[in-house]
A protein has these predicted regions:
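Alpha-solenoid helical repeat scaffolds
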Residues: 7-10, 14, 45, 83, ...
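Alpha-helical adaptor scaffolds
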Residues: 21-33, 38-88
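Alpha-helical segment of the N-proximal tetratricopeptide repeat
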Residues: 1-34
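Structural marker of alpha-solenoid helical repeat scaffolds
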Residues: 15-16, 50, 88-89, 122
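TPR/TPR-like (Sel1-like) alpha-helical repeat modules
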Residues: 104, 109-127, 138
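Canonical tetratricopeptide repeat
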Residues: 26, 60-61, 98, 132-136
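Register position in tetratricopeptide repeats
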Residues: 33, 67, 105, 136-143
Length: 146
């Protein structure tokens, strides 16, 4: 019964309502409930394609990519999603962190440093996150001296 409802929703989204972001998000949730993670990820990708500036769709897509293992190491697709999130929400901590990681991973330590300094400036100095970012920045400095 549930499978049939999800199949009908998928058919409607694919054939009649491709620009309906909320429909794609509903379909992704339905696929997730059914433990069909690949199809959920594809539906979230369609939601982002339908409206690349929709923060909730971007965040859901980023979370799904992260769950699929695309955040360690950071995949180009995950980094692109984080860049899109920054366009909508320039102070998004998670996007700043992962874009710094991607920049470091691709050898652009200057860009990594910029992302992480911006992130660290937003965090309370007594927080664990602040110190984690500080350690990442120190790691960049040490790597640059070797």
């Amino acid at each position: 019964m549930i499978e049939g409802m999800v199949a009908r929703l998928a058919e409607r989204q694919e054939n009649e309502d491709r620009d309906n972001v909320d429909g794609w998000l509903r379909l992704a949730r339905a696929y997730s409930v059914l433990d069909r993670k690949g199809e959920a990820l594809a539906a979230l990708g369609q939601a982002v394609e339908a409206d690349p500036a929709r923060a909730d769709a971007l965040s859901a897509y980023a979370e799904a990519l992260q769950a699929a293992g695309e955040s360690d190491p950071v995949s180009p697709r995950f980094a692109l999603t984080m860049e899109r999130i920054l366009l909508v929400a320039p102070e998004h901590n998670q996007a700043l962190w992962f874009l710094g990681a991607y920049a470091r991973q691709t050898g652009d330590t200057g860009k990594a440093r910029d992302y992480w300094r911006k992130l660290q400036a937003r965090l309370p100095e007594d927080s664990e996150e602040y110190h984690s970012v500080g350690a990442a920045l120190e790691g960049l400095d040490k790597a640059g001296k070797n």
